[in-house]
Amino acid sequence: MVKGAIKNAGRVIMNVYIYDIEVFAHDWFVVFSDIDEKEITVFHNDNVGLKRFMLRQGLLFGGFNNKHYDDWVTQSMLTGADPETVKTHNDFIIMQKGNGWEFPFVQYQKKLFKSFDLRDDIADKGLSLKAIEGNLCQPIVESSIDFNINRKLTKSEAEEVIF
């Protein structure tokens, strides 16, 4: 079980956030959940805000399959990629089956943040997050917004993606 803050002698040394990203042709979102405070933090096409948030000292970020996808697309965001470059990076990984760290925008860069991948802790690496959620009787909520929509999302579409 993932606990929130990592402590040493009662002193907090790392705060843990679980995160996920969603990428569209002209929009990207990063959603963080502070597992101690139960607070959600959302960034939408805000490279500077995202960088200010993620590069603070003492933070650790976790996700599911993030070491192969989310971490590297987030690296593009942190290093100033526009939404269209972020989408190209996304498609490089998903459609072309490329390694996220080999995408030209981030190639040869050191990852700027510390993270762990929850998928590393399961025996069957073929299990999807949806299968795990189903096994736990958790609701599986998917956005109705097409990831290949070729325009900026409307306000209501953005809200659906976030929640």
Residue ranges, per PLM feature:
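Extreme N-terminal basic, low-complexity initiation segments
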Residues: 2-7
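Conserved RNase H-like, two-metal-ion catalytic cores of nucleic-acid enzymes
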Residues: 9-97
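Proteins with a high burden of low-complexity, intrinsically disordered sequence enriched in S/T/G/P/A and R
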Residues: 10-13, 18, 52-57, 144-163
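Metal-dependent phosphoesterase core characteristic of DEDDh/y 3'-5' exonuclease domains
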Residues: 28, 68-162
